[in-house]
Amino acid sequence: MSFKMTQNQYTSLYGPTVGDSIRLGDTNLFAQIEKDYAVYGEEATFGGGKSIRDGMAQNPRVTRDDVNVADLVISNAVIIDYDKVVKADIGIKNGYIFAIGNAGNPDIMDNVDIIIGSTTDIIAAEGKIVTAGGIDTHVHFINPEQAEVALESGITTHIGGGTGASEGSKATTVTPGPWHIHRMLEAAEGLPINVGFTGKGQATNPTALIEQINAGAIGLKVHEDWGATPSALSHALDVADEFDVQIALHADTLNEAGFMEDTMAAVKDRVLHMYHTEGAGGGHAPDLIKSAAFPNILPSSTNPTLPYTHNTVDEHLDMVMITHHLNAAIPEDIAFADSRIRKETIAAEDVLQDMGVFSMISSDSQAMGRVGEVITRTWQVAHRMKEQRGPLDGDYVHNDNNRIKRYIAKYTINPAITHGISEYVGSIEPGKLADIVLWDPIFFGVKPELVVKGGLINSAVNGDANGSIPTSEPMKYRKMYGQYGGNLTSTSMTFVSKTAYENGINRALNLKRMVRPVKNIRQLSKADMKNNSATPKLDVDPQTYEVYVDGEKITSNAATELPLTQRYFLF
C-alpha cells in the first residue's frame, strides 16, 4: 500500500528533500539537497501522533549497551558541511557523533543506521539546518564574556592568546610563559567552549619557547608588537617543527627588520598560519597579501574588513590606534596606523576569499574584530561575491553548493586542520565531538536556534522560565544545562601540545575538562585546506596598492547595503 502527497505537504512534515533548495537567511545563496538518507514513508518524527513511539520508530527491546542506540538523535536535519549538503538524521552517543544516516527501529523499518530506543532523546530538525560548531582561531582572550557571545553566534571553539585586559593581550593574542598558560588553562574550566592557547614566540633562546610548549601552549604567536623579526620567526619555527605545533604570524607592518621577502626567506618551506593576510590587521605594508600564493602558508583574514563596505576604511584608523597602544599626538604612530589601511587591498580581500586563495576567516576579537560576527560576516562576503562575480563553476540557479561549501570550510574544518584539532572538531562526521549548531533557515548565519556542545544542549533561544510554554516572551538566548555543574567540563575540550598532554598537564593542574593534544601540523600545506587551496601568482603595485592575480587586477565595490543586518537586530 502506498500513499502520495504533494511536495509542499512532504516538506511541511519532514523538511526538504533531494533537489529542494533552501535560501540562507536573506542572502542570495541557495543550498540544494544532494542526498536524503530517509526511506520515504518511514521517516522518524517526534510528537503527538508521530512515528517515534514505543513499538513504532522507537525500538522497545534495545538498551543503551547496543552501540547503535543513540543518546540523542537530531532528526531530519539539513546538514551543511564542507563536503556535503544532505538531509539526514544525526546519531549522538557519549557526546560524540557516531552516525549520519537514517534513524528508527530496525525491527520494522528499512535501512536503519541509528537505533532509537527508550534511552534516546530527540531534537526535531525538520525544516532546520545543522552545521558544525564554528572555530575562531584569532581570539584575544581579553574578556571571559567573549565565550558566551561567540557561542550564541554558533562558534564553539576559541584559539588564541591573552590573560585578560592587559596591553599585551589587547594587542597580541599571546599567553606568555608557563605561569600565565597554566592560569588560563585553569580559567578555561569555567568556559562553555573548547579552547587552545598560543604562547609568545619571541625568543632567541629556544628554552624560553620550549617551556611554553611544555606548559600546554598549542603553538606560538609571533607578533610585531613584540618584534616580528626574521630571527624570532625562524627560532619559533624551529621549535614548532620539533614539537609539532603551529606558528601564527602577525608580520612586521613597518618593515623594520625586513620586507615580506625577508620574512618568507626566514620561513623557508615551513608551514605557518598567516594572520589577517590582507594586512589591515597588521603585517608587511603594502604587500603581505602576496604570501597567500605560497604553498606552505595557511592564510586567514579577520572580520573587521569583511565584507568591504563604504564604512570600512573610515572606522579602521581609530581601531588600530586603540588596539596597538598608539598615541594620536605622535606623528609616527599616526603614520603606522595609516600604513595598514589600504582600500585597494581591502577591496581585493573579498575576491581572494571567494577564489579560495584565502583559506580561513576569524575574528581578531576586541583587537579590531568582533567575536560574535565571524559567521555572519562570512556569509555576507559570500552573498556580495555572488552578487558581483556571479555563480562559481558548477553552481547554477538555486544551487550555490560549491560556494557554500567553500565558505563554511573557512570557519570550521580549515581552522581545525590548521591547528591540529580536526580529529576532534570542525565537521559533522562520525567520531567527532558533537558540537552542532541548529538554525532556522530564516535566521541562518545570524542567530542560531540552539547549540549542542559535546552532545548536550548548551545554549538555546527560549522563553520566560515562568511561562506556560517554552515560547513565552521574551524569547532570548539562555544558558542550558550544558553550562551547569559538571557538564561545563564534561562537554568541552581543552587543547594542549602533545608534550604537555603526554606529561600529564591535566593531572598536574587538576583539570576536569577533556584535554586533547594537537597533532599532524608540521606536514601540512595549503593543499590540505578544503575548498580553499588556490595558489595563484599574486602581485601588489607598490604605488597604487592594486592587487593582481595571475596578472589580472582584482577588486570589489564597497557595499552600501548587506543582508543579515538591520532586519535581524531590531530587538
Swiss-Prot record:
An example Gene Ontology biological process: urea catabolic process
Protein name: Urease subunit alpha
Post-translational modification: Carboxylation allows a single lysine to coordinate two nickel ions.
Disulfide bond annotation, renumbered to this chain: none
Upper lineage: Bacteria, Bacillati, Bacillota, Bacilli, Bacillales
Coiled-coil ranges (or none): none
Residues that, per the record, bind Ni(2+) 2: 221, 250, 276
PROSITE patterns per the UniProt record, alphabetical: UREASE_1 (PS01120), UREASE_2 (PS00145), UREASE_3 (PS51368)
Needed co-factor(s): Ni cation
Catalytic activity as recorded in UniProt: urea + 2 H2O + H(+) = hydrogencarbonate + 2 NH4(+)
Main location, first listed in the record: cytoplasm
Primary gene name: ureC
